[in-house]
Amino acid sequence: MKGLSHLKNKQFTALVMAMILASITGNLFANKGLEIAILSDKNNDDFIDSSSSMTMNLINKRGEVVTRKLRFKRLEVPTDGDKSIAIFESPRDVKGVAILSYAHKVKADDQWLYLPALKRVKRIASKNKSGPFLGSEFSFEDFSFQEVEKYDYVYLKEEIYQEKPCYVVERKPLDPYSGYTKQLVWIDKENYLVQKIHHFDRKSFHLKTQLFKDYRKYEGFFWQPHEIEMINHQNGKRSILLFDDVKLKNGFTDRDFSQNSLKRSR
């Protein structure tokens, strides 16, 4: 009996040690995932403001393309998330439509949509931000900036993607109204630039893949992808954003990102 008791004690000790090791390993992977996310986010620091022209191509499963033109402006807010405004310039049926976004580090983001036909500004409720943005495969949630504090992170592995060594990090949105249960993010090891995101829907199915291409560096520090593609695996559609005429330090102020500025944006 003494030998059996000794064996049970050894098994119990081994079990406790395994649990402690698993906890430590889990914390290390979580911390590494967060560290990678923070380093990636630093690519967006200190740009002050930016502007660009955008082309949005909506491609259905038959390969037919609808093209829209936009102007995009962004303002850095050092103490919180960034502000942005996207204004449609063509075609005629969406001309003047604008979306204003205030990203926040912790609380839910604020978004407003201006519809010129109705001459009114409509606030987008948090629970509706998973819906498609004006017929594209991007959601309203995708059009807001992904602040580091909005997610829990776990480092998964290293993997080669497009001939680039990448970290693969899993992040889970803390927002209960997010359209995603989790996202897998590929971040290159050289510059900590996001290369690809797999988006999983509320049923944990792989809903969309987001690709970031043609990164270019501005003023020696600010990285801007000139192409972002969103592929919807459930409906076979794709949306592509093409960026051009990128400029930093335009002198924008908070006044350029107010609800009244939406009405002046035509």
Descriptions of predicted regions:
Residues 73-76, 154-160, 214-215:
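Short amphipathic beta-strand and strand-loop transition segments with alternating hydrophobic
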